[in-house]
């Protein structure tokens, strides 16, 4: 058996008839499958044991030889070799065809490869192959042309006229003759000559032909191999036939298709032997051709062959295609052993790195480990009795299980796995019951809740797998989100509420102004009811052992609350004492105003001070981030557990409930509504008088109602009591927001109709008061649309992620530094006047391309190729620098990947990225995962020009697929000045741009808003009208840099508008993949073909070679491909075939004789090799374990 890990590459090509015969173990002559009485395979049939091997291990067909001792013997009676039955999965057979047939992939594909080689149209080919016309194969000395088509009538006429001086034929034989006659070298030379002069359609056709002919010439495939003389028969175990309960048989469709071929082939042989009339033979040949077509790709031509119940049969091509095909079903998505799944419930008592595993499940999953341990401990004599013990669940098994699972991590996965945090490792603890217990803090990463979600468990078996799970995948190690580098394990819901309640302050609470010597005394007073959690008290600062207090602060009293004393117990000692939710308190120290001299009037000071806000969800997140930055990850995870425990404890103590009485309806509501109604009546009056248009009226009415809803919302939030439970829930960030709240107690506001247009009649009632029937009816539209949108969005978002992963799957960090001298100029991203992404955010974790110098002092803040961290980024921004040259994936020179310097920091760990990190997949997941949070709809701006601006998910798809956008903007193709703007017919406007050399005029579409005025200076690629730019147009008039920047900014705009943060580098990696190809314009003296798409690296290599010899290099233009197109254009045919258009990709690859170098991840998963990323990188795989070496004297012990 060949070892998968020793593969270097994989080739694909056309099989010659001799090659097919050499694969085969015998010819299949009969269409029979198995004998219905003996249920044994028929001889020479489709399941013949002589050809394909025995059905039972070490046993021949007739039973003369049984047992392994006859291994390799060929039975003299039945001719079956005695061997393992599994050879029936690998041995092939063949069928000798009585007449050649064409292979439908090469004849029917688009473009028709056979047609291109022969320079015939697919129509003509079809007529010849399916016996409708004759084709002249050799005109002899007649005026006929070679490859000329003749109808039956014409053929007869010419035959009478010229006799046998010319030859014409029909069917695949004729095509075969023509293909054999082709002189590839001569054809290629003629085409190259023709290319020098050809234009238009002739040129494109010539380029296509040249590509195919060159492919045949370079790959060593012969064109005549596109015609089959021999048909391979795949191994019988891959097209099985099984007996069902009722004695009936179920069989693979392929057997039916093979049977049809064999039947027709045998009939044709008989007819030929009998010397039947040509018309009958021709018909039989055509039927054979159709049978082979159906076998290879049923339904590609004409009506598909159907089985019982009019179901089209699944041919060989269908076995590969689509989600259920071989690639996606069995090679990329295997089911694995040592796995289980169950419902999840919350495990609030667990530590960050633990999960609860049901006992029965654990026993089954760790069975082999338990068996080994039982034998080793002497509790069972052998493996068999150990197995029996486990199956009977004897008591001693549980103790062994406990010891086996200790320190053995398991992987938990929740579908859909949208990003890498969808699978994490935990240390199992055994629990009663049948549900898996999950730590509450990892729910955000999994997007899990406990309303019936299920999760899968997998056991890493080998020592390496366990080590990787423990070091890289343990939940306690994955605190940051790979998409933006912010903590993903932040407390939510109850935990937020508990910590919020704990850190509340109230004026005049019981025991205000008491002074305590330390925390314990304060807690004692709290437990005995002298003070409340929210009471402001004073504590001796030196008793708190906080390292960040200054000496002066230590000698004083600290004003705080009992709750905050408790909260600060969970923070490390060297972290500032948290007394107010401000940036300075988190990052620097506790503000001085909370300290007072001993002996001052505590009560009076407290009464003077303002109340501090409690700690909301965002602040908790910032505290976690800061702790992560300052301390080790272990410390952070311990602190998170403590924060979780506090949250649960105090949300329970708070006893927060919601009752109807908590929803207080606003007193002024009626008055506000009446004022709004008066304004609306006024607008209607103006409209009736014809002072405003219908559009304006609609816009104004909508804006009046929405502003009155905002007024109600503002007043409502102010009127609420601090300790109103609903207010606390929404203010802390635990659940609900101001808008939900307004709907409960204020008014529901405006609703949209099913078409998405806003209905101008608002819903004035709130849920507390109850809706009228009409109001209820109006609000159902929105609810229904919401549900429908969500369902559609999930599917769309998933498909987007799949395409993104596919295009970037081979982008891996391959080296430390690619040595490029290019970079990008980073400045803050703006939308109008609003900053969408600050410069500071764009700089953190990147390498500087040029030294960054302080504009005033001239000191170097960051050197060249030095990492910019948070402090340096802040320094740069504070120095007033607005743009910085940084290294970027856009300009990285590493082939098939990115280098460490151009990528920068790994957002998931906050440290340098490692060589071998699969950054392409991380990027794809980071962009795809928030896809479900984006909106589906295009915003309808009530019929205003510059119409529907696409946003949300559709806009992201539009950008990554490089489609022409909706509401396209006109851009200037030259640098110059706007000379004039004229009105032309139908409210269109003409913009004339005058450059130094030429003048261009552009017609802006009806009602478009212009972005320039007369006399403005414009540069090429600048927008003249409002709307989105077509990136392909932009690439034509500007360069790659402009397009890269445009796509990056646009993608960021969509996500940031929806409040989703994504690191720039992820978008950069994706956009880089879209701009990898160059379209060759002129080949120069290189071997490349004009008009072909080449990888940038292949293009530069080809040019380097020629330039060294002092010849003319090729020229080309960068091409922007959408992600689907880019995935299909990848160098790896395995990856492309498993993505989409499987047959087209394989046809193309076979003709070109492509070699897959197995550089990406998908290709390696398909052939079952370790992926070349992480510890699977070739340079790590070659590390050999050394025997136990004694430390030598010159070794230095590590501190």
Curated annotation (Swiss-Prot):
Which parts of the sequence bind Mg(2+)? 449, 451, 453
Coiled coil ranges (UniProt) are: none
Q: Which SMART domains match?
A: RPOLA_N (SM00663)
Q: Which GO terms describe its cellular component?
A: DNA-directed RNA polymerase complex
Quote the record's binding site residues for Zn(2+) 1.
60, 62, 75, 78
Q: Name one Pfam family in it.
A: RNA_pol_Rpb1_3
What GO molecular functions are on record for this protein? DNA binding; DNA-directed RNA polymerase activity; magnesium ion binding; zinc ion binding
Record-linked InterPro entries:
DNA-dir_RpoC_beta_prime (IPR045867), DNA-dir_RpoC_beta_prime_bact (IPR012754), RNA_pol_asu (IPR000722), RNA_pol_N (IPR006592), RNA_pol_Rpb1_1 (IPR007080), RNA_pol_Rpb1_3 (IPR007066), RNA_pol_Rpb1_3_sf (IPR042102), RNA_pol_Rpb1_4 (IPR007083)
Give the record's cofactor note, including how many are bound.
Binds 1 Mg(2+) ion per subunit.
Report the cofactors. Answer: Mg(2+); Zn(2+)
Q: How does it assemble?
A: The RNAP catalytic core consists of 2 alpha, 1 beta, 1 beta' and 1 omega subunit. When a sigma factor is associated with the core the holoenzyme is formed, which can initiate transcription.
Functional note? DNA-dependent RNA polymerase catalyzes the transcription of DNA into RNA using the four ribonucleoside triphosphates as substrates.
Question: What is the protein name given in its UniProt record?
Answer: DNA-directed RNA polymerase subunit beta'
Q: What is the organism of origin for this protein?
A: Bacillus pumilus (strain SAFR-032)
């Amino acid at each position: 058996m060949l070892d998968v890990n020793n593969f270097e590459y994989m080739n694909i090509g056309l099989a010659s008839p001799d090659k097919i015969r050499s694969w085969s173990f015998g010819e299949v002559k009969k269409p029979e499958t198995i004998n219905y009485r003996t249920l044994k395979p028929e001889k020479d049939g489709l399941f013949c044991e002589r050809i394909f091997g025995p059905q039972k291990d070490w046993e021949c067909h007739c039973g003369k030889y049984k047992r392994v001792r006859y291994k390799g013997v060929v039975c003299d009676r039945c001719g079956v070799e005695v061997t393992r039955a599994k050879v029936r999965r690998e041995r092939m057979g063949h069928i000798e065809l009585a007449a050649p047939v064409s292979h439908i992939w090469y004849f029917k594909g688009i473009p028709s490869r056979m047609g291109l080689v022969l320079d015939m149209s697919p129509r003509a080919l079809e007529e010849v192959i399916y016996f409708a016309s004759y084709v002249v194969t050799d005109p002899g000395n007649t005026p006929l042309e070679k490859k000329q088509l003749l109808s039956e009538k014409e053929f007869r006429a010419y035959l009478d006229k010229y006799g046998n001086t010319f030859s014409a034929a029909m069917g695949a034989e004729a095509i075969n003759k023509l293909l054999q006659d082709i002189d590839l070298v001569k054809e290629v030379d003629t085409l190259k000559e023709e290319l020098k002069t050809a234009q238009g359609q002739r040129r494109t056709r010539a380029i296509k032909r040249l590509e195919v002919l060159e492919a045949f010439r370079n790959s060593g495939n012969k064109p005549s191999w596109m015609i089959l003389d021999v048909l391979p028969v795949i191994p019988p175990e891959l097209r099985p036939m099984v007996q069902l309960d009722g004695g009936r048989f179920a069989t693979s469709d392929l057997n039916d298709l093979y049977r049809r071929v064999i039947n027709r082939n045998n009939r044709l042989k008989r007819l030929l032997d009998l010397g039947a009339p040509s018309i009958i033979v021709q018909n039989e040949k055509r039927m054979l051709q159709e049978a082979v077509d159906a076998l290879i790709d049923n339904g590609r031509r004409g009506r598909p062959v159907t089985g019982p119940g009019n179901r089209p049969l699944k041919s060989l091509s269908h076995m590969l295609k689509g989600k259920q095909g071989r690639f996606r079903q069995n090679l990329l998505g295997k089911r694995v052993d040592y796995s289980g799944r169950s419902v999840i419930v919350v495990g609030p008592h667990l530590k960050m790195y633990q999960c609860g595993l049901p006992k029965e499940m654990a026993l089954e999953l760790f069975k082999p480990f338990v068996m080994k341990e039982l034998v080793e401990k002497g509790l069972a004599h052998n493996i068999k009795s150990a197995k029996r013990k486990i199956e009977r669940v004897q008591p001693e098994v549980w103790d062994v299980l406990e010891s086996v699972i200790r320190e053995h991590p398991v992987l938990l996965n929740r579908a859909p796995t949208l990003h890498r945090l969808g699978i994490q490792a935990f240390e199992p603890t055994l629990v009663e019951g049948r549900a898996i217990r999950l730590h509450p803090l990892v729910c955000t990463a999994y997007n899990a809740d406990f309303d019936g979600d299920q999760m899968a468990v997998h056991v890493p078996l080998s020592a390496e797998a366990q080590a990787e799970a423990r070091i890289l995948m343990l939940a306690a190690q994955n605190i940051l989100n790979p998409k933006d580098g912010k903590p993903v394990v932040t407390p939510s819901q109850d935990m937020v509420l508990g910590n919020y309640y704990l850190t509340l302050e109230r004026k005049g609470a019981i025991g205000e102004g008491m002074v305590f010597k330390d925390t314990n005394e304060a807690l004692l007073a709290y437990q005995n009811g002298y003070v409340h959690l929210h009471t402001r008290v004073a504590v001796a600062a030196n008793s708190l052992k906080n390292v960040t207090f200054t000496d002066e602060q230590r000698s004083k009293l600290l004003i705080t609350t009992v709750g905050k004393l408790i909260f600060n117990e969970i923070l490390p000692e060297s972290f500032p004492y948290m007394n107010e939710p401000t940036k300075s308190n988190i990052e620097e120290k506790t503000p001085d105003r909370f300290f007072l001299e001993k002996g001052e009037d505590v009560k009076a000071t407290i009464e003077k001070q303002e109340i501090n806000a409690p700690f909301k969800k965002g602040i908790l997140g910032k505290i976690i981030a800061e702790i992560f930055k300052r301390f080790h990850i272990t410390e952070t995870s311990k602190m998170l557990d403590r924060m979780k425990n506090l949250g649960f404890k105090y949300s329970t103590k708070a006893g927060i409930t919601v009752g109807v009485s908590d929803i207080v309806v606003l007193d002024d509501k009626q008055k506000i509504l009446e004022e709004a109604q008066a304004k609306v009546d006024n607008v209607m009056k103006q409209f009736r008088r014809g002072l405003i248009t219908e559009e304006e009226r609609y816009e104004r009415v909508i804006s009046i109602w929405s502003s009155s809803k905002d007024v109600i919302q503002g007043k409502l939030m102010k009127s609420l009591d601090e300790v109103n439970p609903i207010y606390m829930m929404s203010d802390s960030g635990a659940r609900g927001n101001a808008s939900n709240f307004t709907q409960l107690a204020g008014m529901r506001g405006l609703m949209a109709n099913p078409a998405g247009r806003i209905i101008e009649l608002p819903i004035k009632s709130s849920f507390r008061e109850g809706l009228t029937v009409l109001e209820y009816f109006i609000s159902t539209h929105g609810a229904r649309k919401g549900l429908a949108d969500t369902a559609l969005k999930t599917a769309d978002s998933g498909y987007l992620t799949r395409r993104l992963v596919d295009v970037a799957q081979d982008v891996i960090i391959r080296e430390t530094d690619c040595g490029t001298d290019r970079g990008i100029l980073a400045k803050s991203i703006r939308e109008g006047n609003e900053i969408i992404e600050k410069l500071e955010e764009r700089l953190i974790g990147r390498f500087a391309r040029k030294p960054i110098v302080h504009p005033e002092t001239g000191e170097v803040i960051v050197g060249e190729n030095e990492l910019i961290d948070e402090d340096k980024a802040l320094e740069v921004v504070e120095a007033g620098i607005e743009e910085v040259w940084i290294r970027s994936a856009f300009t990285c020179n590493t082939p098939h990947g990115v280098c460490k310097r151009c990528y920068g920091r790994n957002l998931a760990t906050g440290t340098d990225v490692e060589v071998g990190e699969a950054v392409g997949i991380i990027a794809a997941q980071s962009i795809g995962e928030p896809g479900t949070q984006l909106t589906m709809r295009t915003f309808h701006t009530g019929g205003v020009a510059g119409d529907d601006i696409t946003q949300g998910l559709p806009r992201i798809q539009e950008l990554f697929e490089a489609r022409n956008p909706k509401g396209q903007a006109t851009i200037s193709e030259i640098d110059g000045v706007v000379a004039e703007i004229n009105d032309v017919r139908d409210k269109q406007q003409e913009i004339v741009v005058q450059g130094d050399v030429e003048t261009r005029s552009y017609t802006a579409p009806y009602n478009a808003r212009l972005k320039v005025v007369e006399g403005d200076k414009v540069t090429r690629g600048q927008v003249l009208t409002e709307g989105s730019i077509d990136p392909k147009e932009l690439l034509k008039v500007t360069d790659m840099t402009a397009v890269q920047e445009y796509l990056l900014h646009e993608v960021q705009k969509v996500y940031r508008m929806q409040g989703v943060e994504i690191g720039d580098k992820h978008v950069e990696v994706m956009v880089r993949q879209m701009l990898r190809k160059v379209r060759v314009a002129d080949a120069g003296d290189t071997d490349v073909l004009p008009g072909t798409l080449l990888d940038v690296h292949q293009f530069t290599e080809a040019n380097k070679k020629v330039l060294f010899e002092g010849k003319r290099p090729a020229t080309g233009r960068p091409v922007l491909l959408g992600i689907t197109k880019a995935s299909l254009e990848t160098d790896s045919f395995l990856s492309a075939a498993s993505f989409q258009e499987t047959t087209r990709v394989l046809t193309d690859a076979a003709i070109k004789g492509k070699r897959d170098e197995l550089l990406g991840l998908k290709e390696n998963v398909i052939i079952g090799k370790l992926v070349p990323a992480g510890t699977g990188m070739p340079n790590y795989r070659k590390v050999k374990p050394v025997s136990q070496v004694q430390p030598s004297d010159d070794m230095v012990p590590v501190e």
